[in-house]
Amino acid sequence: MMIRHALLSLFLLVLAAPAAAQSMRTGGEPARPGFGTAIAITGGQVLVAEPNGVRSPGAVYVYGEQAGSWVEVARLGAESPAAGDLFGASIAASGDRLIAGAQEGETGGVAYVFDGEGDEWRRVARLSASDAVPSDSFGTAVAIAGDVALVGAGGADSSRGAVYVFRRDGAGNWSQVGRIAAPAGMLPDDRFGEVLAVQGETAVVAATRADSGRGAVYLYSGEAWQQAARIAPDSLTANARFGSAIGIADGLVLVGAPGFNGFRGAVYAYGTEAGSWTELGSVPFEGTPQERFGSSIDVAGEVAWIGAPGADRFAGAIYSLGPGTSGPFGAEPVKLTLIDSLPQGGAFGVSLALGENVAAVGIPGEDYGMGSAAIFDRAGDAWTLANRVESEAGSGLAAMTGEPQTCDGQVGAFSCSNVDLVAFLPVASIGGDRGVRLNDIWGWTDPETGKEYALVGRVDGTSFVDISDPANPVYVGDLPKTATSPGSTWRDIKVYQDHAFIVADGAGEHGMQVFDLTRLRDRENAPVTFTVDAHYTRIQSAHNIVINEDSGFAYTVGNSGGSETCGGGLHMIDIHDPLNPTFAGCFSDPSTGRQKTGYTHDAQCVMYRGPDEEYAGREICFGSNETALSIADVTDKQNPVALSMAEYPNVGYTHQAWLSEDQHYLYMDDELDELNGLVDHTRTLVWDVSDLDDPVLVKEFLNPNTTSIDHNLYVKGDKVYQSNYTSGLRVLDIADPVEPEEVGFFDTVPFGDESPRFDGSWSNYPYFESGVIIVTSGYEGLFLLRYREADRPIS
C-alpha cells in the first residue's frame, strides 16, 4: 500500500502553532527530527521515516510483526548517509519496493529505490534529475507503482516545479524516461510536483501553492504521461492548499485541502465518466477551525482514512470514510477513537498508511518534535493499538566530567581554540526527557556559601546545576513549566535578590515564575522537583525578561497572548519585593518593530553612567526591536520617553545587544542577516552610543572564521562572549572597541557544518568570579568552559 504524501510544510505549521529569550518567534526553532513524518505499508511491514534525526542522518525504520508485537527489523539510509540529508522526507511503497527522497549537498536532491525480501532490504538505485541544479528540491515527493517511479522537484524552473519519470528495465536498471514540466501558466513558487500519487497508468500531481495557495491538481495517463485533466473546485479559498494529500484507488481519487475554510479542511472525490475526470462531490465535514482535515489520505478497498492533525488543539485525529448512498466514499466521515490519550501538539494524522489488516499513523510532533508512530491491527471491523514506536533520543554525546580538558585544537568531538572544556552534561543528565532541548541560561552565586549555580532553560522547565566544583557539576533539581502551558522553544531567566524570574514565549498563560534560589541549599534528595514561590499573571507569554538589578525593576518583552502586552514592548514590573511583583507601566516605540507596535525582542536596562552627561543617573533601556535599535528613558515608569531609534544596512532581525562596561559602545547581533544571505560572514554591529539621542553605527564586524547565525552575546571586560548557534561559543577581543577580533572559540555542535541555521549554542553566562563560562547548546547540553588569554587573534 502506498503512502499518500502529506505536505511537510503544513506539518511544520502545525507544530509551530501551539508553541513562541532569545530566539525570534518567527523562525528561531531548530529543525525537528519528525519521526513519523512519512509512513508506508508494504508486504506486511510498516515503514516509518525520520528525515532529520538529532545529529544523525535521515532514516527509514522497517517494522515487522513478531510474536504479536511490532519490532524493528531493518533500518534504511542514503548511500553516503550524513546529518541533514533529509533521507525519508518523502517515501512511497509498492509491492516489495520502496522509494525515498533525500537531499545531498548541492545535488538538488536524489531518490533511492530499495527492494525488499522478508526482513532484508537492498538499495538498488540512486535516482537524480538529468538536468539537476541545487535549488530543484528533487525528491521532496515520490510515488511508485511496480516498475515506474515519479519524483517531484518543486524547486525546479524557479519553483514552478517539475516531475521526473523513471522506469526499471528487464535487467533491473532504473533510468529517467521522461520529465513532466509544469503546465502553462504555472508561476514561480507554485511548486508543481510537491505531492504525487500513481496507480497503474494514472499519475496525480499537485501544485498546492498555485492560485494564491488555493492549489490545483493535474492528472496524467498513458505511457507518455499526457495531461488528462486539471481539477480544482470553484469553492476553494485562498490558502486552501488543495492537493496537499492524495489518495488513489481503482479509478477514484480523493484530494485533501487542509487549509480550506479557516483550516477546517476539506476532501474532494473525483472519478471518470465517459473517459473524463469529474468531481463526484466533497466529503461532508463540518469540523472546527484548525482541524486541517485532509492533511493525509490513504485508501484500502472501500475505506479511506483521512488525517486531521489540528483536531483537539493539535493532538490530531483520524476519520474513516466508506461508501454511501451517493457512491464510493459518500458516507459521513466517522472520527475514530484509536488511542485513549494523545499529546497536545503531537499532530496525530500528519501522515498515515492503511492496509487491509494493519494501519500506521504518524505522531511527528510528540516529544517536542522527536515524533513517534502508532501501529494498529485489525480484527473484524475493529482496529486496536498494537504498538507505539519511536527512534532513540539524545545526541549520542556522553557526559565529560572529572578532569578539565585543555583545548589543543580539539577536545573529544569538539573543535576549539583557546577555550578549555571544564565539564559537559548532556540534556538527559539535567532533567531533559526525549525531545527536550536547552535554550536560555543565567547564573547565580549564593551569597552565603559562595557556590555558583547554572540556571538552565529547557523546553519544559528550568534545571538548576551546582557548579561549585566545576569539573564535577551536580544536577540539583527541576522547576517545571507552568502546569497548563505547552512546552516552549523560548524560555528566559534572570536573577534579582537571590530569586529567579522565568518567562516563556508561545506558552499560553505561562506568566512569570518566581523561584527562591536559596532553596537550592537544601538538596538531600537531589534532584528535587520544585514548585514556584510566586506567579505573576499580568502577562501570559513573553519572549524575554530583562532585569536592572540596580533599580529593582524587571521588564518582560515580546509579550503576547493576552493580559497587558504593552504592544510587545517593555512591560515594567516592580520586583523590589521579589515575591510580590507589581505592574509599573508600559513603554513601546511605534516607529520600530515589524508591525510598528514597538515590539521589543530583547533589551538591556541600566542606571546610566556613560559619557552622555545629560542622562547621568537616569534609567535607560537599549531595545533590540526587530527592525532597529531603540533607546528609551524609563526612569518615570508612568511617563517613559523614547530618546532615539537607529536603523542599519541589511537588517534581517534586530535580535539582542549588550553595552561595553563604560557604556560607550553597544554590541548587537542580527538573527537573520546570515540566514537570509544579507551578509556572507557572521556580523556583529558596533554602535557608538555616547550620544543617546543620536546613536551611530561605527563598525560592522564580519567574522572571517564563521558564517553561522549570531544569537546571544554578553560583554565582560574587554571580551565579547557570543553564542553563535552552529559555531558554538565565540570570544571577541574588544580592547580596541571598534575593531573586534576573534581570539577563541568552542564549537558545541560536533555534527555537520556551520551553515546558518537555528541549531546549537543558544546562550552563555560569563560573569562568575571563578571564570567558568556556562553555555547551552540545544540538543547537546550544558558546557562549562574557560577562556585562556590568547597571544594573537584567530585567523
Residue ranges and their predicted role:
Residues 1-7:
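Bacterial N-terminal signal peptides that target proteins for export
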Residues 12-13, 482:
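Short, linear, compositionally biased motifs with a strong N-terminal bias
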Residues 16-18:
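N-terminal signal peptide c-region/cleavage motif recognized by signal peptidases
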Residues 21-795:
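Feature marking well-ordered beta-strand scaffolds used for ligand recognition
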